[in-house]
Regions:
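Bacterial N-terminal signal peptides
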Residues: 7-15
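Acidic, metal/ion-coordinating pockets
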Residues: 19-202
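Positively charged n-region of N-terminal signal peptides that target proteins for export
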Residues: 1-5
């Protein structure tokens, strides 16, 4: 599935870049479920660079950045993957359920280490080392404003992402769709409103 996704991304990026003039073109690229597969970053970097040659790019990540590569998963703060995302130029990211696998303290440190904002509108930090994240960011590209509002699944047991209850202590997760709807007002001040989510197809 990961190879199929990467192939589709490469083809889509090439097609968009081939026909897109530089002026007033903004391409939004999203990575998702990377699962620490850092061996795929060279191909991904090539695809992103080709798009940037002909258009303005916003690069986002929809969660599950680790759990899947022993080297990355044992590294301090999962930094090898984050460093590659810094090099790739990610603009914003949200949380997936596997971000919590590392424990709340490690996740908090990883969020602090990121050079891009990590956002999530439906996670409430009540008694957790994880900071209360901003619900959205607004990015300017080609004179237009792009708002990204983020949410993570709460469809697991006890209304939190999939995982053991213990790793979510001190956190509360509101309904993702209802929370996203609260930010419809951003349409009044932005030209584009994007839901950056890790909520599956439900």
């Amino acid at each position: 599935m990961k190879k199929i996704f990467l192939g589709i991304l490469l083809l889509l990026c090439a097609a968009l870049c081939a026909c897109a003039p530089r002026e007033k073109v903004v391409i939004i690229l999203s990575t998702n479920d990377i699962h620490a597969q850092i061996q795929n970053f060279p191909q991904l970097a090539t695809a992103v660079a080709e798009c940037r040659d002909t258009a303005s790019v916003i690069l986002v990540d929809a969660g599950d950045r680790w759990t899947g590569n022993a080297y990355v998963d044992q590294a301090e703060g999962r930094r090898p993957g984050l460093e590659l995302m810094h090099e790739l130029g990610h603009d914003v990211a949200t949380l997936g359920n596997h971000e919590f696998d590392v424990g709340q303290q490690t996740l908090a440190e990883a969020i602090d280490y990121c050079r891009f904002p990590v956002i999530c509108a439906n996670m409430v930090s009540e008694n957790s080392p994880i900071p209360q994240l901003k619900p959205y960011v607004i990015l300017d590209r080609e004179g237009e404003k792009f708002a990204f509002v983020a949410a993570v699944t709460n469809y697991g047991y006890n209304n939190h992402p999939d995982g053991h209850d213990a790793i979510f202590e001190g956190l509360r997760f509101m309904d993702a769709v209802r929370t996203l709807e609260e930010y419809e007002y951003l349409r009044d001040s932005c030209q584009v409103l994007v839901a950056l989510t890790h909520i599956g197809s439900k």
